[in-house]
From Swiss-Prot:
Obligatory cofactor(s): Zn(2+)
Primary gene name: gmhA
Family: Belongs to the SIS family. GmhA subfamily.
Function according to Swiss-Prot or TrEMBL: Catalyzes the isomerization of sedoheptulose 7-phosphate in D-glycero-D-manno-heptose 7-phosphate.
Annotated binding of Zn(2+), by residue: H60, E64, Q173, H181
Protein localization: Cytoplasm
Coiled coil: none
EC numbers, comma separated: 5.3.1.28
Cofactor note: Binds 1 zinc ion per subunit.
EC main group: isomerase
Protein name (record): Phosphoheptose isomerase
PANTHER family: DNAA INITIATOR-ASSOCIATING PROTEIN DIAA, SEDOHEPTULOSE 7-PHOSPHATE ISOMERASE / DNAA INITIATOR-ASSOCIATING FACTOR FOR REPLICATION INITIATION
GO molecular function: carbohydrate derivative binding; D-sedoheptulose 7-phosphate isomerase activity; zinc ion binding
Length: 195
């Protein structure tokens, strides 16, 4: 196998995973976009959390909502926050309460009835994301999980699960960011009639 074959294999695997998303979870993706739109139309806040690459995806999606998704779409800022963005809170909470509490503690502080938490986990087994989703339920915060594989321990914990049909972390992450982009596109269309 040469380098070109490796590259082509990655691209083909990515395309195949996205085709599986069209075939099996398109309606869930659209539903997620509609939920996020309604939360924002009501003036509530979107929180996002995840670990590692999923943390980066959470921050990326939050930035698209706060700033804008499509270049040239001038619109007002939307309230969205990645819970992995504040290093002081993350390190203080990790030190004082444990890493598992870094997101749930912030939901306890900031989450209000009518807000939405989007938890991202390629395995569905991230304890700190799971605890944040559980805390959200106690505060009247709606929940969406972006997962992979069989959904892990987080499956059926949220109001809506969007489970990428793959067990390959890279393919799940690629699909999660695509799902995030689709959600942002739906939001900009629903709230501002921007395509």
């Amino acid at each position: 196998m040469d380098i070109k074959e490796i590259a082509l294999g990655q691209i083909r695997d990515s395309i195949a995973t996205k085709q599986k998303c069209i075939d099996s979870i398109l309606e869930d993706i659209i539903k997620a976009g509609e939920i996020v739109s309604k939360i924002l139309q009501a003036g509530n806040t979107i929180f996002l959390c995840g670990n590692g690459g999923s943390s980066c995806d959470a921050s990326h999606i939050a930035a698209e909502l706060v700033v804008r998704y499509k270049s040239g779409n001038e619109r007002k800022a939307l309230p969205a926050l990645s819970l992995s963005a504040d290093s002081a809170v993350l390190t203080a909470c990790s030190n004082d309460y444990g890493y598992e509490e870094i997101f749930s503690r912030q939901i306890e502080a900031f989450g209000r009835k009518g807000d939405l938490l989007i938890g991202l986990s390629t395995s569905g087994n991230s304890k700190n994301v799971l605890l944040a989703l559980e805390k959200a339920k106690t505060r009247g915060v709606k929940t969406i999980s972006l997962l992979g594989g069989d959904g892990g321990k987080m499956k059926n914990l949220s109001d809506l699960d969007v489970i990428v049909p793959s067990n390959v972390t890279a393919r799940i992450q690629e699909s999660h960011i695509l799902i995030g982009h689709i959600i942002c596109s739906i939001v900009e269309y629903n709230l501002f009639k921007m395509e």
